[in-house]
Each structure stands twice: as C-alpha cells, then as structure tokens.
C-alpha cells in the first residue's frame, strides 16, 4: 500500500480517468490515507465465493465489499488488521454520516464514502473505471441506495 496520495484543491475527492482518486489537500491525514488505501486496491477483482482471506496487513488477491471497506479503514488507521463483515460494520464507529468518512452497511452489503466519493464493489454508481468486478471509486456516493435495501449509516469518531 502506498503512503502517498495525490491531492486536489477541491473540498471533495476527485476521481482520475485511470480510476484512482485524489484526496482534498484540506482533508485530515486519516482521510488521505483512506484514499491511498483505496487506490492500492482499486483494480483488484471481486473474489469467488470460496475465497476467504486473513489479515489486512497484506494485500489479498481479491476484495469483496466488506474486505474492501475494511482495507480502506485499516489503511486509515481506523480498524485493526482483522477484516470485518458487512454485518460487523453495521456497528462500526458512531451513528450517522460523518464529515469525511461514512459507511453504509447491512447484512448483505457495505460501502464507504470518503471525502465525497464512494468506494464500492456494486455498479449502481456508474460504470467501473477501470473496468472490472472488484472495488472501484464511484462519483455518486449514494447511488447504491438505488438497490432498494435499507442501510445503517455509520462514521468513524471525529471524521
């Protein structure tokens, strides 16, 4: 995982044509680290049903929604090296949306919004860039609400 992330003067993150994201220069270090973590896995595939992985301290060959969200939180220093399930992330942090980071979780799916852009494995937020089935940055942070499911909204304390 890279410790560096490109920065933008904008107040929200910006997605580049190659699919990686730029963090706002004004964002806290944890937010910039979260975007760097997402960039590190933004072209990884979605795993097959029988693939399961361990510690977040090493890169996995594939990421599902909870693995990707856990990796971003871990990269930001907000989660231990143990990946959480989407159900486990329903109780992460504090209730409600955050200023910089917000999670949307239920028993079947989870995604994370960092500095105004979503990091997700579902395609409600537009076509994935780069193409593929795994985690990608999405410009519309709330597009997944279009799936008709109910989500618990959480955020890390202070963010």
Each language-model region and where it sits:
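Solvent-exposed, acidic/flexible segments
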Residues: 24-31, 58-66
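...with weaker cross-activation on analogous glycine-rich loops/strands in unrelated enzymes
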Residues: 63, 70-159
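Short linear capping/connector segments at secondary-structure termini
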Residues: 16-20, 49-56, 88-89
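Active-site nucleophile-His-acid catalytic modules used for acyl/amide transfer and hydrolysis
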Residues: 39-63, 82
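Generic structural marker for isolated residues within well-ordered, non-membrane alpha-helices
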Residues: 35, 69-70
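Intrinsically disordered, low-complexity
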Residues: 1-48, 129-159
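Short, flexible coil/linker segments at or flanking structured domains
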Residues: 19-22, 34, 51, 92, ...
């Amino acid at each position: 995982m890279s410790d560096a992330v490109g920065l933008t003067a904008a107040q929200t993150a910006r997605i580049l044509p190659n699919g990686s994201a730029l963090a706002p220069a004004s964002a806290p270090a944890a937010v910039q680290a979260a975007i760097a973590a997402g960039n590190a896995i933004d072209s990884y595939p979605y795993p097959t049903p029988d693939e399961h992985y361990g510690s977040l301290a090493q890169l996995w060959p594939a990421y599902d929604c909870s693995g990707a969200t856990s990796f971003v939180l871990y990269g930001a220093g907000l989660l231990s090296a143990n990946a959480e399930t989407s159900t486990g992330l329903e109780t992460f942090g504090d209730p409600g949306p955050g200023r910089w980071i917000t999670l949307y979780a239920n028993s079947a799916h989870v995604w994370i919004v960092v500095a105004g852009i979503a990091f997700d494995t579902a395609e409600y937020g537009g076509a994935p860039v780069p193409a593929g089935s795994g985690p990608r940055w999405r410009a519309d942070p709330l597009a997944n609400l279009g799936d008709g499911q109910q989500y618990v909204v959480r955020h890390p304390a202070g963010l």
